[in-house]
Curated annotation (Swiss-Prot):
Location(s), subcellular: Cytoplasm; Cell membrane
Region (Dimerization and phosphorylation): 2-153
Record's protein name: cAMP-dependent protein kinase type II-beta regulatory subunit
The family this protein is said to belong to: Belongs to the cAMP-dependent kinase regulatory chain family.
Molecular function, one GO term: protein kinase A catalytic subunit binding
Composition skew (Acidic residues), residue ranges: 86-96
Name of the gene this protein is made from: PRKAR2B
InterPro entries: cAMP-dep_PK_reg_su-like (IPR050503), cAMP_dep_PK_reg_su (IPR012198), cAMP_dep_PK_reg_su_I/II_a/b (IPR003117), cNMP-bd_CS (IPR018488), cNMP-bd_dom (IPR000595), cNMP-bd_dom_sf (IPR018490), RmlC-like_jellyroll (IPR014710)
Cellular-component GO terms for this entry: cAMP-dependent protein kinase complex; cytosol; plasma membrane
Residue numbers carrying Phosphothreonine: 69
Amino acid sequence: MSIEIPAGLTELLQGFTVEVLRHQPADLLEFALQHFTRLQEENERKGTARFGHEGRTWGDAGAAGGGGTPSKGVNFAEEPRHSDSENGEEEEEEAADAGAFNAPVINRFTRRASVCAEAYNPDEEEDDAESRIIHPKTDDQRNRLQEACKDILLFKNLDPEQMSQVLDAMFEKLVKEGEHVIDQGDDGDNFYVIDRGTFDIYVKCDGVGRCVGNYDNRGSFGELALMYNTPRAATITATSPGALWGLDRVTFRRIIVKNNAKKRKMYESFIESLPFLKSLEVSERLKVVDVIGTKVYNDGEQIIAQGDSADSFFIVESGEVKITMKRKGKSEVEENGAVEIARCSRGQYFGELALVTNKPRAASAHAIGTVKCLAMDVQAFERLLGPCMEIMKRNIATYEEQLVALFGTNMDIVEPTA
């Protein structure tokens, strides 16, 4: 089936997508409201409604980076133009120094060609419908690939097994000076991560090609065309011999899109099963799913330390966590001076006490065996778990009873300390 894409829609969504990838907002709806309100205000000030114009950053060019700085990354020409790096999240720090990159005005009167591509529903695909693709690599190649991928935002939320599948599936592509890696208007076939080399970004405007930026030994491009079935928005040309790591379209969508969809669905079910979150509305629980991250700890690894400032709240997804506490000024029975006061298993949570009382951590937590936890930062905790706060505060009485039984005192876990 061929679907006619309204003029300007692709550019609008691409610009919004990159803004989300750059800023990682905890509240996506609020961020979208602010983003599109800003666009509308900019258009009103200019006296025209150019919905294809994203006034601060260009989605296919990634975050503006370099801007004349000698650091490696993506650099954009002073005159803003349309480009196709489609990513560049890893250049976000450079973007803060270089300033925002202004996007070009898209001609909304030019009719957009229809886009016909396969539909992809991650829920309909069987788990093993596709055989796993493995491109053998030497230890040196794998190390270089891991280094090149470590700051790519698309891979940030993949667990170790998923990341291993991505690394296995990626293939090395050597390029010569002057070679076109992708061409504007072509269908997207691969996602690319730069290992080494310099590349220019060219965009045709009114039939004339212009260089709008470049990559210097770092960066990635090509994911938006794969995610949204849109043609390439620019041409990427090698300006020196170099090497890229490629990930094919099918593997990209299967691993990145499908696994993210599966993980969201799994976390939705898990969050819904937690009794202390029952007081949240469905929409509030979905917001929790959006902001939680996964952390894996090895046997004996410390998760939180007594006395540290609180920055996260944890829910045990799998494994067991030991909670220990040191009595003030007195060594207890264990060699490390701490006594075990509780254990947490799947569905139980810890780390909330310091967030509720605004005090340093009252206890330490260590992994028993391999432990996987869902973690939520303090800002999201305060914003999203307000309805659950009374339940958590009621637990303080239970904690105090445990401490009195163990130490003969409640350890002042509630009263403010200096």
